[in-house]
Regions:
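Feature captures C-terminal
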Residues: 27-30, 40, 50, 146-153, ...
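Flexible, glycine/charged-enriched surface loops at secondary-structure junctions
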Residues: 88, 220-223, 336-342, 372-378, ...
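Alpha-helix initiation and N-capping motif
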Residues: 135, 318-330, 334-337, 341, ...
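Acidic, metal/ion-coordinating pockets
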Residues: 22-314, 321, 352-364, 405, ...
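Hard-cation-handling environments
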Residues: 298-390
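Bacterial N-terminal signal peptides that target proteins for export
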Residues: 1-8
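Short, compositionally biased low-complexity segments
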Residues: 37-47, 303, 331-342, 389-393, ...
């Protein structure tokens, strides 16, 4: 008996190292990601000819792309394929699903959230445009989500507690993966934040959160609605972030980016941060395949990655349940927003500094109110127009904000200062800006006189930003209504590429 026990003990002793060796030395994870979808629940098209050097020019498919139901079907297909290989798949969104189409303007994010839920998203964060609602509506959207909303740096002003979930840890094979989410500090200027939300500094919040996560996670992933520049800063300045899935800057990163950290490159340690971002509107689905391995010291690292942007094309099947959700929200508004209000003689797109959609809006307001000039902020016009019929939905997608027309009078000196500070899009005015200095400016074909007062117009957002010291009159009329009336009256509108705005050197951004 004693001999049998001894033999058994020896066998167990021999087996223990073998079992330890059998523990997984690697794990894989696939992350499917979207950002800045801005209400594009249905398929859409870009202009046929893309601006030279633009992200659009890189895209292989630009016509009849995207749509939440197709996206969900593609994600489901990839989940099934990866499940057969034993690889988990996460579907994540990095915010700004609001503000962009009639779905957003009519349902304040609820149609988007219902579709996101139906598509089976696993995690998400909010962007600044989700805060372009009331605080009550933001809380409602948080409550409607069937997946965790990660928001470490958006806290209730009264309680200083995160609006969503600050962070969480998930198990992927034998690897503990920590996740957290953040929104750009620009969100602090939006209505919901002004009501009662503090948007904390991204670098400080990330530093504290990563320190907390590193005590209980092997890998750290950030869902960052902060833009490409901020993501690079976070990667460089906050040790311990392995992956950043980004948004906000509408950057198209076909193979991702990598920010190196340090010079001591070890085997199985890429020693830095992977950054991914999938442009905008859900025309493509980002796919990031990650391999986790232990380094020589037994620490889990991201040892390999592969990032791709998968086109969502018209030949793809739609997921029926998601399609039904989208249709449920579309049908009540289809007749109104499907109405054809005019025609575009050609694509309204970009050619250098000439932005035909901005020129259309600026011309519409200036001509309607018979003022000498009009100004529009960068970021205030959100989409091109494709040649052919123009529907109300097209104009809402171009101008999705609740902006009112503002009339004001300004001296030539004040106008030149506005041009230098904000490089706005214009009508009735032509100018040339070099390294932030106005070198040429005319109104009505004549040089601007510094002491003369001119009658102008703009939108309420830009007025609040730039015209604080200039008296102004709010007409109360929505810019979108002015634009719609203008297109109806014209019948057919033609894009203007006339060199009215030339900006050389540093560009000043003031938009959303």
């Amino acid at each position: 008996m004693t001999r049998r026990l001894l033999i058994a003990a020896c066998i167990l002793t021999l087996c223990v190292p073998a079992l330890a060796l059998a523990q997984p030395a690697a794990a894989r994870l696939t992350i499917l990601h979207t950002n800045d979808t801005h209400g594009h629940l249905m398929p859409f098209s870009y202009p046929a000819i893309a601006p030279a050097g633009s992200a659009l020019e890189q895209m292989t498919e630009r016509s009849n792309i995207g749509g939440m139901a197709r996206r969900a079907a593609l994600a489901q297909k990839i989940r099934t394929e990866q499940k057969g290989r034993g690889i988990p798949v996460w579907l994540v969104d990095v915010g700004d699903f609001c503000d962009g189409t009639p779905f957003s303007t009519e349902y304040k994010g609820e149609a988007d959230m219902a579709a996101i839920n139906a598509a089976g998203y696993d995690f998400a964060t909010f962007g600044n445009h989700e805060f372009n609602n009331t605080l009550e509506q933001v809380r409602k959207l948080l409550g409607q989500a069937t997946h965790p909303i990660l928001l470490a740096n958006a806290v209730d002003r009264a309680t200083q507690k995160p609006l969503g979930q600050a962070w969480r840890v998930e198990k992927v094979g034998g690897v503990r993966v920590g996740l957290f989410g953040m929104v750009t500090r620009e969100a602090a200027t939006y209505p919901a934040a002004k009501e009662g939300v503090d948007i904390l500094d991204e670098i400080k919040t990330a530093t504290v959160t990563v320190q907390t996560l590193r005590k209980q996670a092997d890998i750290v992933i950030l869902l960052s609605h902060g833009g490409e520049d901020m993501d690079k800063r976070l990667a460089a300045e906050v040790p311990g972030i392995d992956v950043i899935i980004g948004g906000h800057s509408h950057t198209r990163l076909p193979v991702g980016e990598f920010v190196w950290r340090g010079d001591d490159l070890k085997q199985n340690d890429i020693n830095g941060t992977v950054i991914a971002q999938a442009f905008q509107w859900g025309g493509e689905l980002g796919r990031l395949d990650l391999l986790f391995e232990k380094d020589a010291s037994g620490v889990w690292r991201v040892s390999r990655y592969r990032e791709r942007l998968l086109p969502i094309t018209q030949d793809m099947q739609a997921e029926p349940m998601v399609a039904a959700v989208v249709d449920r929200f579309w049908q009540p508004i289809a007749a109104r927003f499907g109405e054809v209000v005019g025609k575009a003689a050609a694509d309204f797109s970009s050619r250098g500094d000439d932005e035909a959609p901005y020129n259309l809006v600026a011309d519409a307001v200036r001509e309607t109110y018979n003022v000498e000039f009009e100004m529009e902020n960068t970021g205030g016009v959100r989409a091109p127009l494709v040649a052919g019929d123009i529907t109300r939905a097209d104009l809402v997608t171009l101008d999705p904000f609740d902006n009112r027309v503002i009339l004001f009078k300004a001296t030539g000196t004040q106008i030149k200062d506005l041009l230098a500070r904000y490089a706005p899009y214009v009508s009735g005015l032509r100018y040339r800006l070099v390294d932030g200095q106005v070198v040429e400016a005319t109104i009505g074909g004549r040089p601007i006189e510094n002491d003369r007062t001119y009658a102008g117009a703009t939108n309420s957002y830009y007025a609040g930003l730039a015209l604080r010291d200039i008296s102004q009159e709010n007409t109360g009329r929505m810019r979108l209504d002015v634009l719609t009336g203008y297109v109806k009256d014209k019948g057919t509108v033609t894009p203007a590429y006339d060199g009215r705005r030339v900006v050389i050197g540093q560009r000043r951004r003031d938009g959303r």
